[in-house]
């Protein structure tokens, strides 16, 4: 990943966090890493943990196409690790935030 892509990712996550806070979410953690993968944002709302993948672009391709079954499987393993590491067993869902040309699309409770 180049520097521009890295900085774009941070910018996208910043925008996503701002959006989520306006929607009443509490941001618990950003960029949670495990040997299985990474979760961009971990947030909480109404006692439910939300593990949020952020996809950001300023180009013309569809950002949601960058999340596939393999990436989702890595996210699920990372969520399991997060639960074990923190000694919790709460309800959760996986969400996707797509940001394209400053338009935010929030897809809740995604699956394949």
From Swiss-Prot:
It holds the Pfam family UPF0102. It comes from the Bacteria. One of its GO terms (molecular function) is nucleic acid binding. Gene3D superfamilies: 3.40.1350.10. InterPro entries: Restrct_endonuc-II-like (IPR011335), tRNA_endonuc-like_dom_sf (IPR011856), UPF0102_YraN-like (IPR003509). NCBIfam families: PRK12497.2-4. PANTHER family: UPF0102 PROTEIN YRAN (PTHR34039:SF1). HAMAP family: UPF0102. Belongs to the UPF0102 family. This is UPF0102 protein Cj0148c. It comes from Campylobacter jejuni subsp. jejuni serotype O:2 (strain ATCC 700819 / NCTC 11168).
């Amino acid at each position: 990943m180049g520097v521009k892509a890295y900085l774009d990712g941070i910018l996208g996550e910043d925008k996503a966090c701002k959006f989520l806070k306006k929607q009443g979410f509490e941001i618990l953690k950003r960029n949670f890493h495990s040997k299985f993968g990474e979760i961009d944002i971990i947030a909480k709302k109404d006692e439910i943990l939300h593990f949020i993948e952020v996809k950001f672009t300023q180009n013309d391709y569809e950002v949601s196409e960058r999340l596939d079954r393999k990436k989702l499987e890595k996210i699920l393993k990372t969520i399991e690790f997060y639960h074990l590491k923190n000694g919790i067993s709460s309800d959760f869902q996986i969400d996707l935030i797509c940001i394209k040309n400053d338009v935010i699309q929030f897809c809740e409770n995604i699956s394949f």
